[in-house]
A protein has these predicted regions:
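A short C-terminal boundary segment appended to hydrolase-like catalytic domains
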Residues: 1-50, 237-239, 294-315
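N-terminal active-site segment of His-dependent metallophosphoesterases
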Residues: 2-19, 41, 45-141
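Beta-strand-turn-beta hairpins that frame and shape the catalytic cleft
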Residues: 71, 80-93, 185-197, 223, ...
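Active-site neighborhood of phospho(di)ester-bond hydrolases with catalytic His/Asp-centered motifs
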Residues: 93-96, 121-127, 155-162, 180-183, ...
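Short, flexible loop segments at the rims of nucleotide/cofactor-binding pockets, characterized by
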Residues: 98-103, 133-136, 200-204, 223, ...
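Core catalytic region of metal-dependent phosphoesterases/phosphodiesterases
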Residues: 104-189
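Conserved beta-sheet core of the metallophosphoesterase superfamily
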Residues: 174, 231-310, 315
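Binuclear metal-dependent hydrolase catalytic cores centered on His/Asp/Glu-rich metal-binding motifs
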Residues: 174-175, 183, 189-228, 234-235, ...
Length: 315
């Protein structure tokens, strides 16, 4: 299987990095709907961490930790009438929100879960990092441990999340990933093509380059997949002709009501796409519940996961 990418020039990459770092240190977080101060998010994070500390003396804390370590492998078959026949049966391992530096015990659990999994592509939709103050090398090392037993026949693709600093792109490339920063890649097999567009995080670090990347139409009749950290570009991706949208960010709620209803999704828009399978117009989407956790290392009514998605051609 061949693949080619719309590689950014070194100058383009440098401009992206400078802009990203400026946003990371700025006064505002920027989403497709505009900019907002960091104060509200920081206040929310403090409340979440306080909740975790209040639970520590209770049996619920130990239960929540056990739940967070109880990962599952989700297997899905998604059928599309216009999927190229050469890609019928194409398998994608979708991971998101690993945050392994925040809960290192998960790395060995994930390694056991994923051992022996064979796929054609690995798609990592951001938030490799957890603790903003921790060195990213730890996150990368733990991710390498988690993926040790996975066999990936084709590309390893990644996008960045709101917890990932600009330096994470180079670190992931050192691990064998191709990081799509508002650009596209074409996979070709038996003369047929898949077109993949990956965006930098849009929840906190949105720029017009994300929308521009989606707006670029393939010069061929390709099946198009969007890789984005959050579901917040779902409407734009559907309008651009994407057939499949893979994302994470919400952790499925992480701490949910019975039945799995999220209390919070941290989405500023496209909120109906907060968990699992969904439809937006003619596009199918999947929002991962995430492998890891943020805030207190707890889960309730929402298991962490990795997903193997098999593409099928529907007659």
């Amino acid at each position: 299987m061949l693949h080619s990418s719309s590689d950014a020039s070194p100058a383009d990459r440098q401009r992206w990095a400078e802009r990203r770092r400026s946003l990371e240190t700025g006064r505002y977080r920027v989403s497709p709907d505009g900019r907002r101060g960091w104060r509200r998010k920081r206040a929310f994070d403090l409340l979440v961490n306080l909740f975790g500390k209040l639970l520590q003396p209770t049996p619920f804390h130990a239960l929540g930790r056990r739940n967070a370590l109880d990962l599952r492998l989700v297997e899905l078959e998604l059928a599309f009438p216009h999927l190229p026949a050469a890609f019928d049966g194409y398998r994608i391992l979708h991971l998101s929100d690993t945050h392994l530096d925040h809960f290192p015990e998960l790395a060995s659990v994930a390694r056991g879960l994923l051992a022996g999994v064979e796929v054609d592509m690995l798609a990592l939709t951001g938030d490799v990092h957890g603790n903003h103050r921790a060195p990213i090398a730890r996150s990368i090392g733990l991710l390498a441990e988690a993926l040790d037993g996975v066999r990936v026949r084709g590309p390893r693709l990644a996008v960045l999340g709101n917890h990932d600093p600009a330096a994470m792109a180079e670190a992931l490339e050192g691990l064998g990933f191709e990081v799509l920063l508002n650009r596209s890649l074409v996979l070709e097999h038996a003369g047929q093509r898949l077109h993949l567009t990956g965006l930098d995080d849009v929840n906190c670090f949105y720029t017009e380059a994300a929308l521009a990347a989606l707006a670029v139409q393939p010069d061929h009749d390709a099946f198009r997949i969007a890789l984005v950290h959050s579901a917040e570009m779902a409407d734009h991706a559907d309008a651009a002709g994407c057939a499949l949208y893979l994302c994470g960010h919400t952790h499925g709620g992480q701490i949910c009501l019975p039945g799995g209803r999220p209390l919070v999704t941290q989405l500023t828009r496209c909120r109906l796409a907060g968990r699992g399978l969904w439809r937006w117009g003619s596009m199918t989407g999947y929002t991962s519940c995430g492998l890891g956790v943020s805030g207190p290392p707890l889960r309730f009514n929402c298991r962490g996961e990795a997903a193997v998605i098999t593409l099928r051609r529907r007659p």
